[in-house]
Amino acid sequence: MKNFLLCLGMLILLFQSADASLTRSAQRETAGIVPAALYDISVTIDPEGLKYSGHEKVTFTNRQQKSTNYLLFFIYPNDPALTKSKDPFLTVSNVKADGVAVKTEEKGPSFRIYLPEALQTSKTVTVEFDFQAIIPQQSGTKDLFSEAMDQLSSILNPTGKQPDYGIFSSNKDILNLGLWYVALSKFDQDGWDEEAYAGIGDVSYFDPSSFNVRITAPAAYQVVTTGSSIKKVPAKEGKLEHQVESKLTRDFVIELSKQFEQKSAIRGQTSIRSFYLTKHRGSGEKVLDTALRAFEYFYQEFGPYPYTELDVVEAPLYGGAGGVEFPGLVTVSSMLYKEDEMGYNTSTLEQLLNQSPAFDQLLEFVVAHEVAHQWWNAVVGSNSKKYPFIDEAMANYSAVLYFEHYYGREAAEKQMAMQMKINYQMHRMLGGSDQPVLLPASAYNGPLEYSAIVYGKGALGFDSIRKEMGDEAFFAAIKKYYKKFSFQTAGPYDFKEVAQSIQPRNKEKLEVMFKHWMEEEHGDEDIGQGSLEALLATIMEGNSTDNTIDEQQLMKEFEKLLDQIQTPPQ
């Protein structure tokens, strides 16, 4: 028995990944990739006091053919565009570079650490500092209907304020710590990326880095992060130190809750886990099922997933955000999770809308979209601030492909109508104008326009390109694109050029088609402007044969709601 246990232990060590966060096949494939930076962070989180503090060390090697006198970081908790607060939430102190105290400069979220001497090509520097932060608290979690009504009200009565997505926030159940640390900006041949967050769309633009993070938190809290847990060590005062390793990831997120339940499954070398509040068990189990199926399909059609974990975590997101992607972990808004026993009163309109199958399918679509971001954001990087369509339109179309694979082309067409065409048509009905897809996030006038053009028209553009190429060539292009740009940064024309290389005889047609959908304004002719009647018909389409929904009543209730929303408060 002892010999058996010894052999078993040796076998486990033999097959255990040297880099716990990367699959064995990914370790072989990425052996020549050097991380942009090495993060070593120790943080202690006080969930009850809504604060955290710690020490961060970042080692950076200059791999560009130009020197730099400083390192540029972003302190996103101090970005009003993200937190909607003028007050900073995170402070930095005791800054050193290679052990020497140095000068710093902070302007909003931008934080420069000036070096003792210019960092030349191939030279390395290590900077370190202490930090302490306060975690903003949201007033409460809204259900899907309430959130949708808030969004509609903000569209009809614009204030000029952009939404707070809740990426860095907490409510009474969950701490959602996205972008919580001091993050090194991207450094390339043009220098440091100094572009601020536009207040809409994705926040960050980073190269793959390596993280070693030690998180100390009360033992009663479940801690879920990017990367893989190496071990947990008991700490003082009933706390645990969670030691986490994450290789070749562009970001690092932490989620905490005392109320999390977990359900998981293994696919290949990857553990796929769903974390959700106990009261949302039914939805949490559906999330896992969707994540598993999306993972299997995308792995088959796009290429291998490189990480040993994929976590889908319920989080308190707001401002219309259904989910937010991070490497190896995606969050899904609590508003999409249903309580297992719903005993509260709802409005007539909400009761009517809840009978639509479209609302049951929304959670599935969002999970598929967010899982797709592991391929189109985590692995294939892009400048999401400058070219948001590269990952968002592709992830949205990937969710359509998921529906087509599992439910057929008719189901996929319905999702394109619900998730893409409706957004564009609503945008036009409310007076918005058509825009090119190939624009920076900052160029769009609010979240509805951003969603209509980037998520909607952009994804429909990929569907048209697929129809032109045919399935065999299109999916060959996707596989080649994924392999070529894994852990790299894809540009706005890279997928088009890969597609043209797969189908050179069609090069000119693909050029024209890409320009038509991504650079020009043909939304009305390609998608249509729509009407309120058509919009509601699309929402109601697909109800069961014993349909008890009165569409005339639905129309009256919706028009009544619009009148209420558009009437200024007295």
How should these model regions be labeled?
Residues 130-255, 259:
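Extended, low-hydrophobicity, Ser/Thr/Pro/Gly-biased non-transmembrane segments
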Residues 15-53, 171:
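N-terminal, polar/Ser/Thr-rich
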Residues 87-163:
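A surface-exposed beta-strand-loop module
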Residues 392, 396-460, 468, 485, ...:
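Acidic/His/Gly-enriched intrinsically disordered linker/tail segments
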Residues 523-570:
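Long, His/Glu/Asp-enriched segments that create or flank divalent metal/ion-associated functional microenvironments
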Residues 213, 261-374, 378-387, 398:
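Juxtacatalytic substrate-recognition/specificity segment
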Residues 410, 451-526:
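Amphipathic alpha-helical substructures
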Residues 68-100:
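Solvent-exposed beta-hairpin/edge-strand motifs
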